């Protein structure tokens, strides 16, 4: 249940309009939240290679979404990256 509450708060923080649940901004924010949870999990469970592979897949998906957003709307890309604390190439 707590994951759904976390997910809904992330969606509410990053949505572009009232019924927005799938824009690139929201998807990137949700992936970043899940990535951060997996990083914390892997700090405790260093030998969990299945979760590590899942983490790498999520990072790749987020990277592709960020590349799409940077091509489509660079201002939104920079705003989302800054808001989430992501490092971007200069």
Swiss-Prot record:
<dbReference type="InterPro" id="IPR009068">
    <property type="entry name" value="uS15_NS1_RNA-bd_sf"/>
</dbReference>
<dbReference type="Pfam" id="PF00312">
    <property type="entry name" value="Ribosomal_S15"/>
</dbReference>
<comment type="similarity">
    <text>Belongs to the universal ribosomal protein uS15 family.</text>
</comment>
<protein>
    <recommendedName>
        <fullName>Small ribosomal subunit protein uS15</fullName>
    </recommendedName>
</protein>
<dbReference type="GO" id="GO:0022627">
    <property type="term" value="C:cytosolic small ribosomal subunit"/>
</dbReference>
<keyword id="KW-0689">Ribosomal protein</keyword>
<dbReference type="InterPro" id="IPR005290">
    <property type="entry name" value="Ribosomal_uS15_bac-type"/>
</dbReference>
<dbReference type="GO" id="GO:0019843">
    <property type="term" value="F:rRNA binding"/>
</dbReference>
<comment type="function">
    <text>One of the primary rRNA binding proteins, it binds directly to 16S rRNA where it helps nucleate assembly of the platform of the 30S subunit by binding and bridging several RNA helices of the 16S rRNA.</text>
</comment>
<dbReference type="InterPro" id="IPR000589">
    <property type="entry name" value="Ribosomal_uS15"/>
</dbReference>
<keyword id="KW-0687">Ribonucleoprotein</keyword>
<keyword id="KW-0699">rRNA-binding</keyword>
<comment type="subunit">
    <text>Part of the 30S ribosomal subunit. Forms a bridge to the 50S subunit in the 70S ribosome, contacting the 23S rRNA.</text>
</comment>
<dbReference type="GO" id="GO:0006412">
    <property type="term" value="P:translation"/>
</dbReference>
<dbReference type="GO" id="GO:0003735">
    <property type="term" value="F:structural constituent of ribosome"/>
</dbReference>
<comment type="function">
    <text>Forms an intersubunit bridge (bridge B4) with the 23S rRNA of the 50S subunit in the ribosome.</text>
</comment>
<keyword id="KW-0694">RNA-binding</keyword>
